[in-house]
From Swiss-Prot:
Record-linked InterPro entries: Ald_DH/histidinol_DH, Ald_DH_C, Ald_DH_N, Aldehyde_DH_dom, G-glutamylP_reductase_CS, Glu-5-SA_DH, GPR_dom
Entry-linked NCBIfam families: PRK00197.1, proA
Keyword Protein transport: no
Record field: transmembrane: none
Identification of the protein by name: Gamma-glutamyl phosphate reductase
GO biological process terms held by the UniProt record: L-proline biosynthetic process
UniProt entry keywords in alphabetical sequence: Amino-acid biosynthesis, Cytoplasm, NADP, Oxidoreductase, Proline biosynthesis
Keyword Amino-acid biosynthesis: yes
PANTHER family noted in UniProt: DELTA-1-PYRROLINE-5-CARBOXYLATE SYNTHASE (PTHR11063:SF8), GLUTAMATE SEMIALDEHYDE DEHYDROGENASE (PTHR11063)
Its job: Catalyzes the NADPH-dependent reduction of L-glutamate 5-phosphate into L-glutamate 5-semialdehyde and phosphate. The product spontaneously undergoes cyclization to form 1-pyrroline-5-carboxylate.
Length: 429
């Protein structure tokens, strides 16, 4: 029996893999036409996609209701259900996001540099699409529309593999987007949902080297680690956000309190929320009681070192806490001896996403920004500002915490590569 079952599973996995490859081949064929599309053609498609989301909002929300009900019945944590849930406002924001992408400059064809060489050859380096992008992401249906829009504008076809917990929402969104794209004359296969809900489809996408040009995972640490370790397709690693706020001895404490509260509580389920608080030892008696009281009043559970534990209600912090991306109303906290102590703590525990310093000392700020090796380092500002929209990119497909190709919020230009176009007049070597 087990042999028959194993053979059935293997056959099923092979079938899913074949379906994923077939989808990738359709995406490749569609990408050739998209790479040649004008900005006007792409922008028309984006506007149509936005309108389709609004027109078909009732069916999108109905599909999302199925996903939310299933998640709640399965005991999914509230912060994950919040990511999964769509509302009229969130659908409207998705549509507006597509319109915002349409308003952005087209990166394709941009000349980065050019010159006439000594031998008379004219050389230009220009932006070009990757080709076919694979997206693997967790329970955020808005990513479906965001990724489709950014990939289309940057000339890339996209294969979308969202969480099975959002399968109904994603299917409704993709159907609306594909119909809109087809209505403008572009090939709808530039946006596809990866066939299948099982892990076999994820594995097939990760093994589709030669069919998929780049894979971008968005989600928790487990998902990202799995994709990075198992994929044969090149991966752009988007970040787990164990983000720190360090309150320096020269901080304005009113600013510091506002920044800590915003960074932790504004929206807990996102990767740029603060997860760890560091306070200079000189402020232990003045700022620690104040910030603990404010955090607790906001519903935050503080996991602290010995000094923080002197305050009522603070739980002991472990190594696991200091390395944790909570994505909830929890924060780890420690008193550090000085600026170098803060830097050392961040170097040990950071996921290299975003760190912030609060200080009025320019020298301390400069040392912190130079010494801390993260994708974004902020001075006197909340970690919540690490975002493509806030940075003026108009949109982002994720926040990269790796160093190759792209780092930080990934906008349209980060979704392109380059090629060299060289023009001669019968030149031979």
């Amino acid at each position: 029996m087990s042999t028959q079952h194993d053979e059935h599973d293997a056959a099923g996995a092979t079938g899913v893999a074949d379906q994923v490859v077939a989808a990738a081949e359709r995406a490749r064929a569609a990408s050739h036409g998209l790479a040649l599309a004008t900005r006007a053609e792409k922008d028309a498609a984006l506007q149509a996609m936005a309108e389709a989301l609004l027109t078909r909002e009732p069916e999108v929300l109905a599909a999302n209701g199925e996903d939310v009900a299933r998640a709640e019945a399965n005991g999914t944590p509230p912060n994950i259900v919040d990511r999964l849930r769509l509302t009229q406002e969130r659908v409207a924001a998705m549509a507006q996001g597509l319109r915002d992408v349409a308003a952005l400059p087209d990166p394709v064809g941009e000349v980065l540099r050019g010159s006439t060489l000594a031998n008379g050859l004219e050389m230009r380096q220009v932006r070009v699409p990757f080709g076919v992008v694979g997206m693997i992401y967790e329970a955020r249906p808005n990513v479906t529309a965001d990724a489709a829009g950014i990939c289309l504008k940057s000339g890339n076809a996209v294969l979308l593999r969202g969480s099975s917990s959002a399968r109904s929402s994603n299917a409704a969104i993709v159907a609306a987007l594909r119909d809109a794209i087809a209505g403008t004359g572009l090939d709808p296969d530039v946006v596809q949902q990866v066939p299948g809900d099982s892990h076999d489809s994820v594995k097939a996408l990760m093994r589709a080297r030669g069919h998929v040009d780049v894979l971008i995972p968005r989600g928790g640490a487990g998902l990202i680690r799995s994709v990075v370790e198992e994929s044969t397709v090149p991966v752009i690693e988007t970040g787990v956000g164990n983000c720190h706020v360090y309150v320096d001895r020269a901080a304005d404490l009113d600013k510091a309190l506002a920044i800590v509260l915003n960074a932790k509580t504004h929206r807990t389920s996102v990767c740029n929320a603060a997860e760890s608080l560091l306070v200079h030892a000189d402020l232990a008696d003045t700022f620690v009681p104040r910030v603990v009281a404010a955090l607790q009043e906001a519903g935050v559970t503080v996991h602290g070192d010995e000094r923080f534990q002197a305050e009522d209600g603070v739980l002991p912090a472990t190594d696991e806490d200091y390395g944790q991306e909570y994505l909830s109303l929890d924060i780890s906290a420690a008193v550090v001896p000085d600026l170098d102590g803060a830097i050392a703590h961040i170097r040990r525990w950071s996921s290299q996403h975003t760190e912030a310093i609060v200080t009025e000392d320019l020298a301390a700020a400069r040392r912190f920004t130079a010494a801390v090796d993260s994708a974004a380092v902020l001075v006197n500002a909340s970690t919540r500002f690490t975002d493509g929209g806030e940075f003026g990119f108009g949109a982002e497909i994720g926040i990269s915490t790796q160093k190759l190709h792209a780092r930080g919020p990934m906008g349209l230009t980060e979704m392109t590569s380059t090629k060299y176009v060289v023009t001669g007049d019968g030149h031979v070597r």
